[in-house]
């Protein structure tokens, strides 16, 4: 992690990918995401899943230009296994989703590294709580296993103290990480005539006088306040790196990165707010330049008539094939020393590998766009600032999966995309039909999101124009299932109710007018 820190400030884009213990809660009915959802509705539904699951791996690939070589970049790719901080009052709860575990296991994910060696992290609110407890002396060990072990340690040290002389010392071997900090904190609080030091072989306990203890606490390089700050720094773990990434203000690149951004906010910044607009503002202040390669490749794929692909690895393969007219003139990317794992080895769904693919795809697609602008190949003296210029329409446009808009604009209002029209299904002779039954009825033909309009009417929405055309054609003239284009002024129950009320009022007014004229 430390070898990557300095590079972040000198890099151009930073590719990011995150793996989770689960993606989306198995919520039913109105809590499921839908093509009918406004972005704010989609956000509130997804927020629950983000709070339920956690990050198990983050991959970062930092791209830096090679000095003196035109359009040549070095990629520094790193994997970080993470595990929530368990320290003091912090004891997070999270879920595993069976399908996500199976998926990652299929690609060789090392769950032992996640569970045993994961780097701790916390968000700003958690840091404030633990900082207050440690600095005010209100810190307590909360974990039962830790309490048991620390009790054993205190008993051992107390027995040793009865026989030891001032200046004697003992070592508590095999105590590392947060446990070492906890042991030292408890021992220093409980025993006024000892001092502790953390060394490679374990925690060293030394018997000292109370005067010498006061001196060590207030004047040594390991004085109490500095030592507690070091505890906080270690407890923050990866969060310190996250804050440095924010401070660098470099373009952050991902692929279908919306879930990544939600988890970054929740796990490292602050708990996700209820307000969707506040979430957008927060993310934009953290990362002013976001580029989602899914949004970029969507458009360029149509223009170039590239073959349809289903994932990031396939996108990368197409851009490195002869199908790409700028294959030989595009940016050259080499792996840095000590980051050469991916030179010959493909590791799909390993976070650092996918992060490397994100950055590489961005550079290659940007070069393709630049060539289209200049209409010459090779483009003279291509550079990353030029790439950012041609990528401007895609900056802060993050792809949104299954919602009422195709993407979220983090630097302004969201714009409605071009989507297939809403269809209306009118059902005859099928009493008590449910939304699930309607979905099941059409599942062999195409996938629709279904929303009930009235007792016998349902709205149907798909993200493919072809599916909308097919179902209109297939069910034309059907005796019990009538499907047509939805027209708000014609089909909305609210509009129909309003028209009926207006009709009644008009009729009464006309009747009153008629009776008034025929009177004496």
Swiss-Prot record:
Its EC number is 3.1.13.4. It comes from the Eukaryota. It is a single-pass membrane protein. It is found in: Endoplasmic reticulum membrane. Its main location: endoplasmic reticulum. InterPro entries: CAF1_poly(A)_ribonucleases, RNase_CAF1, RNaseH-like_sf, RNaseH_sf. SUPFAM superfamilies: Ribonuclease H-like. It is an enzyme of class 3 (hydrolase). Keywords: Endoplasmic reticulum, Exonuclease, Hydrolase, Magnesium, Membrane, Metal-binding, Nonsense-mediated mRNA decay, Nuclease, RNA-binding, Transmembrane, Transmembrane helix. One of its GO terms (cellular component) is endoplasmic reticulum. The chain crosses the membrane at residues 497-513. GO terms for molecular function: metal ion binding; poly(A)-specific ribonuclease activity; RNA binding. Mg(2+) binds at residues 17, 19, 260, 354. One of its GO terms (biological process) is priRNA 3'-end processing. Its cofactor is Mg(2+). PANTHER family: POLY A -SPECIFIC RIBONUCLEASE/TARGET OF EGR1, MEMBER 1, POLY(A)-SPECIFIC RIBONUCLEASE PNLDC1. 3'-exoribonuclease that has a preference for poly(A) tails of mRNAs, thereby efficiently degrading poly(A) tails. Exonucleolytic degradation of the poly(A) tail is often the first step in the decay of eukaryotic mRNAs and is also used to silence certain maternal mRNAs translationally during oocyte maturation and early embryonic development. May act as a regulator of multipotency in embryonic stem cells. Is a critical factor for proper spermatogenesis, involved in pre-piRNAs processing to generate mature piRNAs. This is Poly(A)-specific ribonuclease PNLDC1. The lineage of its organism: Eukaryota, Metazoa, Chordata, Craniata, Vertebrata.
């Amino acid at each position: 992690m430390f070898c990557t820190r300095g590079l972040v400030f000198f890099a151009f884009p930073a590719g990011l990918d995150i793996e989770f213990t689960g993606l989306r809660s198995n919520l039913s009915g109105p809590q499921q995401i839908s093509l009918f959802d406004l972005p704010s509705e989609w956000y509130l539904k997804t927020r629950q899943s983000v709070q339920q699951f956690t990050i198990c791996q983050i991959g970062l690939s930092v791209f830096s230009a090679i000095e003196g070589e035109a359009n040549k970049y070095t990629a520094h790719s790193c994997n970080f296994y993470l595990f929530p901080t368990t320290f003091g009052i912090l004891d997070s709860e999270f879920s595993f989703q069976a399908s996500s575990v199976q998926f990652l296991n299929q690609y060789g994910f090392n769950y032992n590294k996640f569970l045993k060696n994961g780097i701790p992290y916390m968000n700003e609110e958690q840091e404030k709580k633990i900082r207050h407890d440690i600095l005010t002396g209100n810190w307590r060990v909360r974990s039962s296993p830790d309490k048991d072990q620390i009790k054993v340690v205190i008993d051992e040290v107390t027995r040793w103290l009865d026989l030891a002389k001032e200046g004697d010392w003992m070592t508590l071997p095999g105590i590392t990480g947060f446990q070492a900090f906890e042991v030292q904190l408890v021992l220093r609080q409980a025993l006024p005539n000892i001092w502790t030091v953390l060394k490679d072989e374990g925690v060293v306990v030394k018997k000292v006088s109370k005067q010498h203890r006061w001196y060590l606490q207030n004047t040594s390089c390991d004085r109490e306040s500095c030592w507690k700050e070091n505890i906080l720094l270690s407890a923050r773990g990866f969060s310190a790196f996250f804050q440095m990434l924010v401070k660098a203000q470099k373009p952050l690149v991902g692929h279908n990165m919306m879930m990544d951004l939600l988890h970054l906010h929740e796990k490292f910044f602050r708990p996700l707010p209820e307000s969707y607009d506040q979430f957008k503002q927060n993310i934009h202040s953290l990362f002013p330049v976001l580029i989602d390669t899914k949004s970029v490749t969507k458009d360029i794929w149509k223009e170039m008539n590239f073959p349809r692909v289903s994932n990031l690895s396939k996108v990368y393969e197409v851009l490195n094939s002869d199908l790409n007219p700028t294959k030989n003139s595009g940016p050259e990317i080499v792996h840095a020393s000590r980051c050469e794992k991916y030179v010959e080895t493909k590791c799909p769904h390993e976070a650092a590998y996918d992060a490397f693919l994100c950055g590489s795809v961005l550079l290659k697609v940007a070069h393709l766009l630049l060539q289209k602008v200049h209409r010459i190949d090779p483009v003279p003296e291509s550079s990353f600032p030029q790439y950012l210029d041609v990528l401007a329409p895609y900056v802060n446009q993050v792809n949104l999966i299954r919602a009422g808009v195709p993407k979220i604009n983090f630097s302004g209002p969201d714009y409605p995309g071009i989507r297939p029209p809403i269809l209306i299904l009118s059902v005859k002779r099928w009493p008590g039909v449910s939304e699930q039954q309607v979905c099941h009825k059409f599942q062999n033909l195409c996938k629709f999101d279904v929303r009930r309009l009235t007792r016998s009417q349902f709205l149907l929405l798909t993200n493919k124009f072809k599916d909308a055309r097919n179902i209109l054609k297939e069910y034309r003239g059907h005796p019990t299932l009538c499907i047509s284009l939805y027209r708000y002024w014609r089909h909305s129950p609210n509009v129909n109710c309003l028209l009926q009320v207006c009709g009644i009022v008009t009729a009464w007014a006309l009747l009153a007018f008629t009776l008034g004229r025929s009177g004496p």
